[in-house]
Design a protein with these regions (language model features):
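Terminal targeting signals and extreme-terminal segments of soluble enzymes
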Residues: 1-276
């Protein structure tokens, strides 16, 4: 991993997020411009992409709320009710629901640039003792928006291709993803929102194979059990329900380069289409 974080080419830059944090550390906002590369073949932003937005803004707010301690993500739940279309900007409004001695809980509301609700998410975090390598979040608290994008930052391929997703067995939802400098978090592991994207992709391919229908994931519940530092990260899905209109699946994600250690358990629901 490079010394500076994020490196010059990194998903945090290429997604062109912008952020704004209040100075009291109780609320944050983020904006994501939706481009074609972030969308499924239905033409709307992938659930994993929006989970990544939630993870980034929620994680930053949780770290500020837990200061001077640090945090580790325990779980993320996302529910989408409407499609986020190319050319729109998704706004994520995050607020602290609880900031205790051992736990921080964040709620994130998602809307488009016409203030239509797109979905909602919650995240919970374990509070940990600070270590020397943990970032100092106090510098992020300001009244003005900021971004990690630079002039050349942009996606040059569809999001799953940029992540390096390879389908090994569609029926089993078996996919493989490398852990690279582009996808690592500040701890040197696959970034949490990208782990959710792996769950999204695994469930999608399994449910499409099971139903013969072009279902898209609309709901994710992700429990983070460990880091994926070595890679490749591998996922497989067990289909729980499958019909032409709706499906659900359970997904396990392991770090195959670290004795196939279990990293994540997730559940996903998919439907034929989201409202526009």
């Amino acid at each position: 991993m490079t010394a500076a974080y994020p490196p010059a080419e990194h998903m945090l830059r290429d997604l062109r997020f912008s952020f704004e944090h209040d100075t009291e550390g109780r609320a944050s906002r983020a904006w994501l411009p939706v481009v074609d590369e972030l969308c499924t073949d239905h033409g709307s932003a992938r659930a994993g992409v929006l989970a990544t937005l939630v993870d980034v803004i929620g994680g930053g707010l949780a770290a500020a709320a837990a200061a001077p301690d640090w945090i580790a993500t325990a779980d993320l739940t996302l529910h989408l009710v409407r499609a986020a279309l190319p050319g729109s900007v998704v706004a994520a409004n995050a607020r602290v629901l609880r900031a205790g001695r051992t736990t921080v809980v964040i709620e994130v509301a998602l809307s488009d640039d016409t203030d239509r609700m797109l979905g909602a998410a919650t995240m919970s975090f374990a509070v940990l003792p600070r270590r020397d390598h943990n970032p100092d979040m106090s510098s992020a608290l300001s009244d003005g928006p900021s971004t990690m994008a630079v002039e050349t930052s942009r996606l040059r391929a569809p999001f799953l291709d940029a992540l390096g997703v390879a389908v090994l067995d569609a029926a089993a939802g078996s996919i493989e993803v490398p852990v690279t400098d582009w996808s690592r978090n500040s701890m040197g592991a696959l970034q949490g929102g990208l782990v959710a994207t792996v769950a999204d992709a695994s469930a999608e391919v399994a449910l499409r194979e099971a139903t013969g229908a072009a279902l898209v994931v609309t709901d994710l519940q992700v429990s983070f059990l460990g880091f994926g530092r070595t890679g490749p990260v591998r996922a497989h899905a067990d289909v729980l329900h499958a019909s032409p209109q709706f499906g659900s699946a359970r997904v396990e994600i392991v770090d195959s380069g670290a004795d196939t250690r279990l990293m994540t358990l997730a559940s996903a629901s998919a439907t034929r289409e989201l409202a526009v």
